[in-house]
Regions:
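Proline-enriched interdomain boundary motifs that mark the N-terminal boundary
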Residues: 9-15, 209
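Catalytic cores of peptidoglycan-degrading enzymes
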Residues: 165-312
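Short beta-strand/loop motifs in extracellular/secreted proteins, especially
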Residues: 10, 36-40, 228
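Non-catalytic extracellular/periplasmic "stalk"
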Residues: 26-33, 39-177
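Short beta-strand segments of immunoglobulin-like
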Residues: 16-22
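Proline/serine/threonine-rich low-complexity linkers at boundaries of modular beta-sandwich domains
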Residues: 1-11
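Outer-membrane beta-barrel proteins
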Residues: 19, 64-66, 189
C-alpha cells in the first residue's frame, strides 16, 4: 500500500486571447486546469471572482475592472487550488485602458426633500432635518445597499443563461450615465459627492420594463436608495438591475425571457422624476451597462473569444 502525496500545483492554461477592457467594464477568460480544483477564479486585491466549469471542459471566469480601481492597481491574478491544497497563481494579462467620466451637478431642492420625507424617515428615523437625512442616506444607506448587491451577486447560475445584446427600455432617452461624478448642491452649498453607478433611462411615466435578457429573478423587493428593485441573474456572475420601479410584477425564482415585462418605471427610492435606473452587476459590482446593450461589444469582448477558446480543444 503506497500513498501518493500530491505536492504539485495544478497546471493552468489560459485559452482566450488577451482581453482589452476599460475601467468600469468587464471581460472573460477561458482556461483549462490539469486536475480537479477545489477553488479557482480571478483574485483582484481583496476581491475574488469565481470561475465555473463548463460542459466543454473549460473554466469560464468573468471579472470586472472596477470603477474605483486605479489602472496601476488593476493586476488580476488567476488563483487555482487543487484538492490536496496546492496552489498556482498566474498573472492574467490584460490591456487595461482608462475612460473619461462626466461631471454633473445635481441641485437638491427643498421641494424634493419634502416630497421624500416619508421615504427618508423610514430609512433614517433619527430626529434630524430632511437635508441631514438625505446626506446620510446618500452615504451610509448607499454603502449598506452596495453590500447587499455583493451578497445578491453570489446567487448566480454556473452556466450562461443569456444570449445576444441586452434589451434597453423601449423608446427611452438616456439621462444620467454610469460613472458620472456628481456634486450635490443645496441652496448654493455643496452637500455631497457620489458616483452614479447605472444608466438612467426615461420614457413615459409608469412605462413597462422588459427583462433585458433571459435569466432568473434573484431579488424583487424594496432596497434603500433603489426603491423597488428587481435583480435578474444571467449566470457566471452577470446580473441586471432595475430600480425606482413604481410596481414590481415578478417574483424571486421566476424564470424570465428577454422582453418579459417585470414591472413599471417609477420614482421610488431616491429618484427625482419617473425613470428606470438600469444597472449591470458583475459578481455584485456595478459596471458599465451600455456595453451590454451593444451587440458588437458583446461579440468582440466576450462571445467570440470564448467560442474560439472552446473550439481550440
Amino acid at each position: 500500500w503506497n500513498m501518493q502525496l500530491d505536492t504539485q500545483p495544478p497546471k493552468v492554461r489560459i485559452k482566450t486571447t488577451v482581453p482589452a477592457l476599460r475601467r468600469g467594464s468587464v471581460t472573460a477568460i477561458a482556461y483549462s486546469v490539469s486536475e480537479d480544483a477545489s477553488m479557482t477564479g480571478v483574485q483582484l486585491g481583496e476581491q475574488f471572482f469565481p470561475a465555473f466549469l463548463q460542459p466543454n471542459g473549460l473554466y469560464y471566469c468573468f471579472f470586472p475592472f472596477p470603477l474605483d480601481t486605479p489602472k496601476g492597481k488593476f493586476t488580476p491574478e488567476l488563483l487555482t487550488r487543487d484538492l490536496a491544497g496546492n496552489e498556482s497563481r498566474n498573472r492574467v494579462l490584460v490591456n487595461a485602458g482608462e475612460r473619461n467620466f462626466r461631471k454633473d451637478t445635481l441641485n437638491i431642492s427643498d421641494n424634493f426633500l419634502n416630497s421624500k420625507e416619508d421615504v427618508f424617515k423610514e430609512l433614517v428615523p433619527d430626529d434630524i432635518s430632511n437635508l441631514e437625512r438625505y446626506v446620510r442616506i446618500n452615504n451610509e444607506v448607499r454603502i449598506s445597499n452596495e453590500k447587499t448587491l455583493l451578497e445578491i451577486g453570489k446567487n448566480t447560475s454556473p452556466t450562461m443563461l443569456w444570449s445576444g445584446a441586452f434589451k434597453r427600455l423601449p423608446g427611452s432617452a438616456s439621462k444620467a450615465s454610469f460613472g458620472d461624478q456628481r456634486t450635490y448642491m443645496h441652496n448654493g452649498t455643496k452637500i455631497d459627492e457620489q458616483t452614479h453607478m447605472g444608466q438612467d433611462l426615461a420614457s413615459v411615466a409608469h412605462a413597462p420594463i422588459p427583462a433585458a435578457n433571459d435569466g432568473k429573478v434573484v431579488f424583487a423587493e424594496p432596497l434603500g436608495i433603489f426603491g423597488n428593485l428587481v435583480v435578474i441573474d444571467h449566470g457566471l456572475g452577470l446580473q441586471s438591475l432595475y430600480s425606482h420601479m413604481s410596481e414590481i410584477q415578478t417574483n424571486v425564482g421566476a424564470t424570465v425571457k428577454k422582453g418579459d415585462i417585470i414591472g413599471l418605471t417609477g420614482t421610488t427610492g431616491l429618484a427625482g422624476g419617473d425613470h428606470l435606473h438600469f444597472g449591470i452587476l458583475m459578481h455584485g459590482i456595478q459596471v458599465q451597462p451600455l456595453d451590454w446593450l451593444d451587440p458588437k461589444w458583446i461579440k468582440n469582448t466576450i462571445t467570440d473569444r470564448l467560442d474560439a477558446a472552446g473550439a481550440e480543444r
